[in-house]
């Protein structure tokens, strides 16, 4: 059996001791994600399964629903925004992305179905309830390493990054069909993908904008932008934006700063933040924080300095002790969690002088 530390599924600066969760997986756990309300925990493993636990009073249930649909290790899971119901996506070494919907008693009470009835997404209605496979995306020819749901203001959109070098963008249409855009992102392989906030920093979104297409909004509402970042085996992070003129995603920036594969990329939520923040983690044992002061400004980078966090850090400047596999922002976008190959998770905050400091450290 395999356990996962609950603090790895969400960010906290409290001194409370992390809780170990017995997942009942039979092999290594690769990802653990809480849903929007923190009421469910999804995990995935090399045992080819996804498990979903209910969270009661901060403690996961001892039993889980097990989802079978992959023929290889499952690398990542991602919850859709509750606007679209109880939707969970998973991606695997088998080259598939599976989208699941919970039609059972555990489904969110009052969850809206903006694209129709409970059988939205083309899911068959099931009186027996439980999780249903509503979409199996098989376009990729190699491992799908990362998935990311777009901000809900843009609609039901899922980006998928693959070792075949492509990022596919799945969009659910009002007629129940799925549209696919294929982006040739990194020729030697794509490791991660992350959506940017739907609006530029400091903008406010009207509730009436939900589900609107990207572009200028009427009545003074904020302009919505479809933009995501991809991380590749070419040591590069690329930023893509949907062009209305070309009717496709176009590359708007290529960020060079790492000397080895970029393992993860994460846009920070920009609620109340004055600029755009993007974190990248690499095989070269560094984490870079990229900032952009305005949509037309150049991106600047700052490397985290783990030496201040641990004397055991590597001898090289700004090097972590091992490969950095994951970076994840808090909901407010002001705290960054860094997961390193040495088994440690560190939390970082920017101080008033603009320097990044390690504020917490824990063993995974």
UniProtKB/Swiss-Prot annotation:
Q: Which PROSITE patterns match?
A: WD_REPEATS_2 (PS50082), WD_REPEATS_REGION (PS50294)
Q: Which Gene3D superfamilies match?
A: YVTN repeat-like/Quinoprotein amine dehydrogenase
In the bilayer, the protein is annotated as: Peripheral membrane protein
Q: What is the phylogenetic placement of the source species in the record?
A: Eukaryota, Fungi, Dikarya, Basidiomycota, Ustilaginomycotina
Using the UniProt annotation, give all residue ranges assigned to the region (Disordered).
1-24
Top-level taxon: Eukaryota
UniProt-recorded name of the protein: Protein transport protein SEC13
Q: Name one GO molecular function term.
A: structural molecule activity
Subunit-level organization: The COPII coat is composed of at least 5 proteins: the SEC23/24 complex, the SEC13/31 complex, and the protein SAR1. Component of the nuclear pore complex (NPC). NPC constitutes the exclusive means of nucleocytoplasmic transport. NPCs allow the passive diffusion of ions and small molecules and the active, nuclear transport receptor-mediated bidirectional transport of macromolecules such as proteins, RNAs, ribonucleoparticles (RNPs), and ribosomal subunits across the nuclear envelope. Due to its 8-fold rotational symmetry, all subunits are present with 8 copies or multiples thereof.
What family does the entry list?
A: Belongs to the WD repeat SEC13 family.
PANTHER family, A to Z: NUCLEAR PORE COMPLEX PROTEIN SEC13 / SEH1 FAMILY MEMBER, PROTEIN SEC13 HOMOLOG
Which UniProt keywords are given for this protein, alphabetically ordered?
Cytoplasmic vesicle, Endoplasmic reticulum, ER-Golgi transport, Membrane, mRNA transport, Nuclear pore complex, Nucleus, Protein transport, Repeat, Translocation, Transport, WD repeat
* Source organism per UniProt: Mycosarcoma maydis (Corn smut fungus)
Renumbered ranges of WD repeats: 24-63, 69-110, 139-180, 185-250, 257-300, 319-358
Query: What does the UniProt function comment say about this protein?
Result: Component of the coat protein complex II (COPII) which promotes the formation of transport vesicles from the endoplasmic reticulum (ER). The coat has two main functions, the physical deformation of the endoplasmic reticulum membrane into vesicles and the selection of cargo molecules. It also functions as a component of the nuclear pore complex (NPC). NPC components, collectively referred to as nucleoporins (NUPs), can play the role of both NPC structural components and of docking or interaction partners for transiently associated nuclear transport factors.
Biological process terms from the Gene Ontology for this record are: COPII-coated vesicle budding; mRNA transport; positive regulation of TOR signaling; protein exit from endoplasmic reticulum; protein import into nucleus
Q: Please tell me one Gene Ontology term that the record gives under cellular component.
A: nuclear pore outer ring
Location comes to: Cytoplasmic vesicle, COPII-coated vesicle membrane; Endoplasmic reticulum membrane; Nucleus, Nuclear pore complex
Compositional bias (Polar residues): 1-11
